[in-house]
């Protein structure tokens, strides 16, 4: 059974059909890239998976259980975290406090003591190289540091199964990108976290993705490795423009 599965997922906004019969499956521990031209429906699909939008038809299943149509908070507690292209943090709170607030939001009935949550936050601050700025307000951090903090907030989830990342590398200094990649690898290796990564950064996607899904005009056009996508004439014409 796949970790995540969408079936015939459709969503329209007025006369615009943003997704059309999207059928996607992701296995535990998989890193899946989601690529395609602007307006292809990638972010809409991410929003459908994470409960921000309810589908017009079709369904979303996590470990076989339907999660579509439920509140984003319930989807999060079920094991799905999400980052946004525009970083969402509590600017007046310290980096450490942002992590602890994130844990409180998703922990539910998880039996983790406050001391264990603080230890988890400290460990993540070390992994993300943010320990030196742990007690600074998030608003005082650089763009790269805020991106790392937002990513780490999702890793506070005690039952994280799938992490949906929307343009996590856009506008980020290469030094911070390497730290992001280290974090993704660490949690995949130790916790079998799966990722759905929306990005236009093809060189990075080549390095980390097991497979990519190409969306065009709201529908899945191609699935395979990035090398296979880069050799597909339709993908080249509609999106890549040239081999990568």
Residues of each region from the PLM?
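Conserved ABC ATPase "signature" region
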Residues: 114-133, 182-185, 234
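The feature captures the beta-strand-to-loop junction immediately N-terminal to the Walker
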Residues: 35-37
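Catalytic Walker B motif of ABC-type/P-loop ATPase nucleotide-binding domains
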Residues: 163-167
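Helix-to-loop junction immediately C-terminal to a conserved catalytic motif
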Residues: 50
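Conserved ABC nucleotide-binding domain
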Residues: 68-69, 124-140, 161
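H-loop/switch region of ABC-family ATPase nucleotide-binding domains
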Residues: 199-200
């Amino acid at each position: 059974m796949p970790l995540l599965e969408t079936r015939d997922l459709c969503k329209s906004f007025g006369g615009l059909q943003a997704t059309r019969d999207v059928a996607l499956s992701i296995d535990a521990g998989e890193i899946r890239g989601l690529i395609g031209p602007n307006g292809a429906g990638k972010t809409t699909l991410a929003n459908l998976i994470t409960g921000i939008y309810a589908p017009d038809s079709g369904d979303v299943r996590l470990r076989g259980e339907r999660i579509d149509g439920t509140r984003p908070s319930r989807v999060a507690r079920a094991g799905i975290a999400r980052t946004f292209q525009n970083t969402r943090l509590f600017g007046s709170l310290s980096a450490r406090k942002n992590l602890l607030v994130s844990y409180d939001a998703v922990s539910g009935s998880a039996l983790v003591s406050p001391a264990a949550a603080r230890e988890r936050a400290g460990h993540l601050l070390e992994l993300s190289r943010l320990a030196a700025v742990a007690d600074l307000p998030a608003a005082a951090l650089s763009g790269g540091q805020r991106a790392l903090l937002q990513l780490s907030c999702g890793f506070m989830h005690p039952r994280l199964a799938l992490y949906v990342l929307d343009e996590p590398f856009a506008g980020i200094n290469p030094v911070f990108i390497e730290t992001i990649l280290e974090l993704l690898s660490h949690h995949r290796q130790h916790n079998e976290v799966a990722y759905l990564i929306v990005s236009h950064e093809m060189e990075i996607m080549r390095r980390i993705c097991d497979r990519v899904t190409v969306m065009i005009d709201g529908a899945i056009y191609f699935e395979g490795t990035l090398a296979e996508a880069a050799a597909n004439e339709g993908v080249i014409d509609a999106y890549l423009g040239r081999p990568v």
